[in-house]
């Protein structure tokens, strides 16, 4: 008796062919699956077990911004998976300058199996996905940073063994892409995300509405507050990002506004978890914690500051997990790429997770 044929539809993955443009486009269970898959692939890497799920695939890496972690992570992840990554920087292609996003997408989609884009406009990355016909992965836009989120919550899960019920406090500019992504993703996964920032730098109503909608189902309690003591109380994770992005001009105003929100050891003690092993510090990097960079020296010269968003003491402390977090960019991006392009057998994802 011959075995029944299994059609492609029957073995198709719930992720196959999909783009990751923003966290909210996936279900909470799917985001959690990618977190766990990233942890699995990290274990395979550590044990030198091959996992060439993308053998023969070609991947375009489109960068409009400079990058250390995202570029390195996508490159090494693609190679580990057996794929060939091709870096195309701002000076290499005509995207948005001499050629429309639609035309560029159609051309690249005919040559590459998937596209990563790190740029500015969310609409641009959405148009790449719309017209290319291949999976597109958002490596960062002004609105969202979804690949960073898989790495971040991988790091949290590695350290605490679970996600639901934890409290993550982001301190700094609450209007940027990191704050947006953290409060939405945390609300999806049952993590209480507090944005601690001056009132003028709180997330938009639109972002808070998205977070609150997910929180209704997950039980998370998202919060935006300017009160540092209230915001950090009970925190398990204190998270920071740069106060001003490279190329922005409003440094003086932003530095003055955010200096009271610098992460210090005293702030960590305010959490109530500094001495019980239930507190870590995270930062998506780069960080201005000393004067060992050109920007650090410029900041010291202009504002008399040797540290900005985080003190060097905290950055180098026992709480610090930013380099573990940075390594996890590679493992998490590998999970995203393999799940959406690798023709893996993932017919469903469990709805219940910790």
Curated annotation (Swiss-Prot):
Class in the EC hierarchy, top level: transferase
UniProt cross-references to SUPFAM superfamilies, sorted A to Z: Aspartate/ornithine carbamoyltransferase
GO cellular component: cytoplasm
Keywords, alphabetical: Arginine metabolism, Cytoplasm, Transferase
Residues holding L-ornithine: 177, 241, 245-246
Catalytic activity: carbamoyl phosphate + L-ornithine = L-citrulline + phosphate + H(+)
GO aspect biological process, one term: citrulline biosynthetic process
GO molecular function: amino acid binding; ornithine carbamoyltransferase activity
Listed InterPro entries: Asp/Orn_carbamoyltranf_P-bd, Asp/Orn_carbamoylTrfase, Asp/Orn_carbamoylTrfase_sf, Asp_carbamoyltransf_Asp/Orn-bd, Orn/put_carbamltrans, OTCase_ArgI
Subcellular location: Cytoplasm
Membrane-spanning parts: none
One Pfam family, short name: OTCace_N
Domain of life: Bacteria
Keyword check for Membrane: no
Residues the record lists as binding carbamoyl phosphate: 67-70, 94, 118, 145-148, 284-285, 329
Enzyme Commission number(s): 2.1.3.3
Predominant cellular place of this UniProt entry's protein: cytoplasm
Pathway: Amino-acid degradation; L-arginine degradation via ADI pathway; carbamoyl phosphate from L-arginine: step 2/2
PANTHER family with a match to the protein in the record: ORNITHINE CARBAMOYLTRANSFERASE, CATABOLIC, ORNITHINE CARBAMOYLTRANSFERASE, MITOCHONDRIAL
Similarity comment: Belongs to the aspartate/ornithine carbamoyltransferase superfamily. OTCase family.
Function: Reversibly catalyzes the transfer of the carbamoyl group from carbamoyl phosphate (CP) to the N(epsilon) atom of ornithine (ORN) to produce L-citrulline.
Protein name according to UniProt: Ornithine carbamoyltransferase, catabolic
């Amino acid at each position: 008796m011959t075995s029944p044929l299994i059609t492609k539809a029957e073995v198709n993955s719930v992720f196959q062919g999909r783009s990751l443009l923003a966290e909210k486009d996936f279900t909470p269970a799917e985001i959690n699956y990618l977190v766990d898959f990233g942890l699995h692939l990290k274990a395979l890497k550590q044990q030198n077990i091959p996992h060439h799920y993308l053998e023969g695939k070609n991947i375009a890496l489109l960068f409009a911004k400079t990058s250390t972690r995202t570029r390195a992570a996508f490159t090494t992840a693609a190679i580990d998976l057996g794929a060939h990554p091709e870096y195309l920087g701002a000076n290499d292609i005509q995207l948005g300058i001499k050629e429309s996003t639609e035309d560029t997408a159609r051309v690249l989609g005919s040559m590459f199996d998937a596209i990563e884009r790190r740029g500015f406009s969310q609409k641009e990355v959405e148009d790449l996905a719309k017209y290319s016909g291949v999976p597109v992965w958002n490596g960062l836009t002004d609105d969202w940073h979804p690949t960073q989120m898989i790495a971040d919550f991988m790091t949290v899960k590695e350290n605490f063994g679970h996600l639901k019920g934890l409290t993550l406090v982001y301190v700094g500019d609450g209007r940027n892409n990191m704050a947006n992504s953290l409060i939405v993703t945390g609300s999806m996964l049952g993590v209480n995300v507090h944005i601690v920032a001056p009132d003028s730098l709180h997330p938009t109503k639109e972002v808070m509405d998205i977070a609150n909608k997910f929180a209704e189902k997950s039980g998370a309690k998202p919060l935006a507050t300017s009160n540092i003591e209230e915001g950090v109380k009970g925190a398990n994770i204190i998270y920071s990002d740069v106060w001003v992005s490279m190329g922005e001009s409003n440094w003086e105003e932003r530095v003055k506004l955010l200096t009271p929100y610098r992460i210090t050891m005293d702030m960590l003690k305010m959490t109530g978890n500094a001495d019980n092993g239930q507190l870590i510090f995270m930062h998506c990097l780069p960080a201005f914690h000393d004067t060992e960079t050109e920007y650090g020296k410029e900041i010291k010269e202009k504002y008399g500051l040797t540290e900005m968003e985080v003190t060097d003491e905290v950055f180098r402390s026992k709480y610090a997990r930013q380099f573990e977090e940075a390594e996890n960019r590679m493992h998490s991006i590998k999970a995203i790429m393999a799940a959406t392009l690798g023709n893996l057998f993932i017919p469903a994802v469990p709805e219940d997770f910790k």
